[in-house]
């Protein structure tokens, strides 16, 4: 039976750190603030927004929503980004993606001020992740994966790690962050040949495949740590991950459940990035 890597334990510890940082800011008459830009009414965006704003309220971070219609023009979106860039009281910005197809996503993303890019979407932020340099925020989801690794004292040095999925949002940055922890990293994707054999070689597996239950027992072995990034709804209408939990849990050493794993940590990482952006702007140390 695998050890469950519970998001709530990581979140409790992380939230305590965030509260201390907020107290430091408050002592300097600063309230950290998140700007939220949402275009349209996608259910998953609204759900994430609800969780993010609730976490902000819990941790003493304010927020302001900038809601645009699905058919918003590129000019309208760019004007909104200019508005949040110029707003002195907004320290970090969450821009929901994917954007509607009629918009130039690359142009819009890179209009965001890099210092307010708390979800690592601009080219400058991504470059910081890939080069292993300070100066930008990594995307929140892979950051949450690494928070779990750190919290549970999972040693990456010299270990074989496999990341399943090569998206710029999760897979690629997660691989780079594991490299920075001295893991030997392989990225698997839809064109990988004999993927089960590749994944079985890994000590640490981060799964961001985007398909419910696609990773089953044939990919896994004893001794592995599995971090499941996926959030899907199965045929029974229940939340599930990209890993077949019933197959994996009796086999591997440790695994994140879905729900109750990476998702809740991601929300706290988002808030931490806003708070850290406020500290940086104020010239205060990030504790």
Residue ranges and their predicted role:
Residues 92-156:
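Anion-binding alpha/beta catalytic cores of soluble intermediary-metabolism enzymes, centered on
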Residues 31-40:
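Short beta-strand segments enriched in small/hydrophobic residues
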Residues 96, 208-209, 229:
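Short, well-ordered coil/turn residues at beta-beta hairpins
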Residues 1-30:
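Positively charged, low-complexity intrinsically disordered leader regions
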Residues 76-88:
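Short, well-structured alpha-helical segments in soluble
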Residues 39-53, 136-225, 234, 238-246:
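Glycine-rich phosphate/diphosphate-binding loop of Rossmann-like nucleotide-binding domains
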Residues 106-126, 230-282:
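Rossmann-fold NAD(P)-binding glycine/threonine-rich loop
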Residues 56-70, 185-187:
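Short beta-strand elements in bilobed, periplasmic/extracellular small-molecule ligand-binding domains
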């Amino acid at each position: 039976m695998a050890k469950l890597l519970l998001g709530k334990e990581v979140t409790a510890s992380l939230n305590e750190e965030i509260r201390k940082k907020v107290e430091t800011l408050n002592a300097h008459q600063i309230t950290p603030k998140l700007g939220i830009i949402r275009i349209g009414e996608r259910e998953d965006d609204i759900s994430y927004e609800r969780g993010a704003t609730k976490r902000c309220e819990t941790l003493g971070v304010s927020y302001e929503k900038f809601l645009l219609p699905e058919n918003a023009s590129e000019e309208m979106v760019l004007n909104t980004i200019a508005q949040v860039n110029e707003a002195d009281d907004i320290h970090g910005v969450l821009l929901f993606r994917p954007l509607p197809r009629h918009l130039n996503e690359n142009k819009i993303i890179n209009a965001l001020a890099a210092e307010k890019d708390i979800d690592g979407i601009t080219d400058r932020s991504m470059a910081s992740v890939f080069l292993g340099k300070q100066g930008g925020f990594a995307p929140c989801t892979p950051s949450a994966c690494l928070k779990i690794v750190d919290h549970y004292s999972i040693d990456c040095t010299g270990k074989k790690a496999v990341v399943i999925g090569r998206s710029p949002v999760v897979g690629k940055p997660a691989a780079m962050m594991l490299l920075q922890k001295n893991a030997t990293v392989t990225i698997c994707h839809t064109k990988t040949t004999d993927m089960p054999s590749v994944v079985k070689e890994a000590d640490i597996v981060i799964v961001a495949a985007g398909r419910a239950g696609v990773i089953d027992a044939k990919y896994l072995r004893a001794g592995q740590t599995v971090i499941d990034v996926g959030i899907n709804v199965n045929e029974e209408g229940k939340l599930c991950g990209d890993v077949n939990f019933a197959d994996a849990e009796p086999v591997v050493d440790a695994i994140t459940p879905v729900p109750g794993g990476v998702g809740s940590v991601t929300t706290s990482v988002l808030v931490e990035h806003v708070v850290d952006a406020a500290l940086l702007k104020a010239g205060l140390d990030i504790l």
